[in-house]
Amino acid sequence: LEGIRLGTTLQHGKLDGHIRKDGKRTPLSLHLKGEDITFQFHTNNTWSGFHMQLQEGEAKLYETEQGKATPFPPKKIGEAIINSDVTYEDLSLRFLYWKDAEVVGEDKIKMQSCYKLRLRNPGKDGRYALVYIWVHKKYGALMQVAGYDVQGRLLKRFHVTDLMTVDKMQTLKKMNVETYEAGTNKVTGITYLEFKKPSKAKRRGL
């Protein structure tokens, strides 16, 4: 999973893009500093956001109030950002850091050979109890995600529609996030995440 985690994607230190919903674009910026990843989005002429800290192999979300970082309330982790289909746990991809990951098979996504992995939520926070991800066999890039609740009902699907090469690695450029009516195949909303290829800079890692 190391190759598809945000720490690897952000080796340049910064990634810019936007969240698009119903034709409205909201600027988005991701920054890496040590083991802290900052997510910022621009609304009403103001930048706001949250942090994800990598601690002992776990990814924990924090919000900043009056200059002090405090842990996310469990319910907030699964809340939507700026009325989109993207939640805080979706944007952070924190499930990629869950320790209970297992390869359960192989599949074809957009005619590309992929490994299918199952990840189980080690806690009770967030909306997902179980997540399946599909990783490109050749490039090691994330191709698709499906998130399920504790009752096994499908809640979300992420479809990666475009990749970009960063430091000779294939990583996320465009992704669609679909919300489903729980337990059905009915899509109730869709939001697009799009990132720009970072300009060349000094290579940075975790």
Where are these regions (language model features)?
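Flexible, processing/modification-adjacent segments and terminal tails
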Residues: 1-2, 6-12, 56-129, 149-150, ...
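N-terminal mature ectodomain segment of secretory-pathway/periplasmic proteins
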Residues: 1-65
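Short hydrophobic/aromatic-rich beta-strand segments that constitute the beta-sheet cores
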Residues: 17, 37-41, 59-63, 71, ...
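Short, surface-exposed beta-strand/loop "edge" segments at domain boundaries and coil↔beta transitions
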Residues: 23-27, 44-51, 62-71, 125-128, ...
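Short amphipathic beta-strand/extended segments with alternating polar/hydrophobic composition
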Residues: 27-33, 50-55, 69-76, 158-160, ...
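Short, ordered beta-strand-loop transition motifs
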Residues: 31-35, 105-114, 165-168
